[in-house]
């Protein structure tokens, strides 16, 4: 019964999709096709990232990561987060396993939040697209405000959350 409760949201969405298909067949099939394409995208994107996370876990020593992204890393933490998030490719859900590994290895919460923010606003493909579509002024304002915002959010998160508390948190217990 606990396993069924854990997947209740999946079953609710599946039943909703079936009901939608009975009400409006073309819309239901379109939703099913979109869902299938999203699942396929995830299946192609996640395995390489999980392999990368596993290799990073084995190759990068905790002390090295703490030196560059730990509490006392200073400008190195900002630069490393900018580099790691800026050269990234793919949707944000790809960044979460990397962020969890960084947290486990001793990276500061401030730099993890900043890394996730850089991933969403200032990764290279987004910057190139914004420069070509929206121009220099918009892009620089958007990225500048985004980076400042996410760094400040990282400072706030660091004040309210303990690293050990986040490492012990298990989201599946709430399901």
Tell where the protein language model's regions lie, with residue ranges.
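Hydrophobic transmembrane alpha-helices that form the pore/transport pathway of multi-pass ion
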Residues: 91-117
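Hydrophobic transmembrane alpha-helices of multi-pass solute/ion transporters
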Residues: 1-44
């Amino acid at each position: 019964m606990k396993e069924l409760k854990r997947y209740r949201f999946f079953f609710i969405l599946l039943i909703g999709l079936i009901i939608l298909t009975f009400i409006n067949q073309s819309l239901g099939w379109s939703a099913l096709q979109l869902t299938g394409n999203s699942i396929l995208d995830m299946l192609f994107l996640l395995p390489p990232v999980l392999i990368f996370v596993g290799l990073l876990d084995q190759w990068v020593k905790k002390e090295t990561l703490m030196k560059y992204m730990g509490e006392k890393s200073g400008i190195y933490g900002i630069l490393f987060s900018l580099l790691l998030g800026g050269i990234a490719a793919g949707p944000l859900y790809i960044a979460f396993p990397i962020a969890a590994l960084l947290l486990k290895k001793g990276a500061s919460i401030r730099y993890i939040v900043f890394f996730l923010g850089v991933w969403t606003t200032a990764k290279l493909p987004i910057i190139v697209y914004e420069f070509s579509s929206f121009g220099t002024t918009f892009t620089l304002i958007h990225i500048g405000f985004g980076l400042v915002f996410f760094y400040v959010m990282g400072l706030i998160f660091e004040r309210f959350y303990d690293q050990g508390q986040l490492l012990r948190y298990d989201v599946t217990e709430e399901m």
